[in-house]
Amino acid sequence: MYDEIDASAWLGKFSKVPCPEGAWIVKNKNKYYLQYATPGTICNWYCDVVLESDSVNGGFVEQPYNPVSLKVGGFIGGAGHSCVFKDKYENWWQVTSMWVGNHDEFERRIGLFPVSFDDKGRMRTHTVLGDYPMSLPQKKFNPQDISAFGWMLQSYHKKSTASSSLPGFEPEKAVDENVRT
């Protein structure tokens, strides 16, 4: 169900210092949150980190709870290069870039995940079940209550058949929980 990437094969192959991208700032209560994407745009562990400040003009401090958004398993992975917004019901959301990489290594899909801020002001992106269809709540909701989404995977590795298939496109790949197969 979870993809693994052997990053050790990449050690020593890059000489340039990576740069963060996709910076985004939001304000919640009296705190500013600067979010940006880390290197790894062609991997399912593409993610965002967050820095906090009391001023929009600076003094941002990287947070020990980083990454603030990460989704390495499930149907589709990656949760980087994001933007965060608040809807009319006061629910926070993150729109993010999810990695596919089938037809091109930079192939993407858009993801939408609920965001919350705990009582200490720590920002959290809730990626669990975020790659399943969901009905957008028409009221304020608790993003930690995963039953609010109404979906649970029932087909993982279930028996599947087809009258015909091409090599590499066998019917069992329809239920393997991987967008790249």
Predicted regions and their residues:
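Surface loop/turn signatures of beta-propeller and other carbohydrate-active proteins
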Residues: M1-W24, G59-C83, T125-Q144, W151
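Short loop/turn segments immediately following beta-strands, especially the blade-tip
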Residues: M1-Y2, V50-G59, S116-M123
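Hydrophobic core segments of beta-strands in well-ordered, beta-rich domains
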Residues: E21-G40, N91-V100
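A contiguous binding-surface segment within folded domains or other stable secondary-structure elements
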Residues: A37-T41, W45-G74
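Repeat-solenoid scaffold signature
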Residues: L70-I110
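Disordered, acidic Ser/Thr/Pro-rich linker "stalks" and the adjacent N-terminal cap
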Residues: Q138-T181
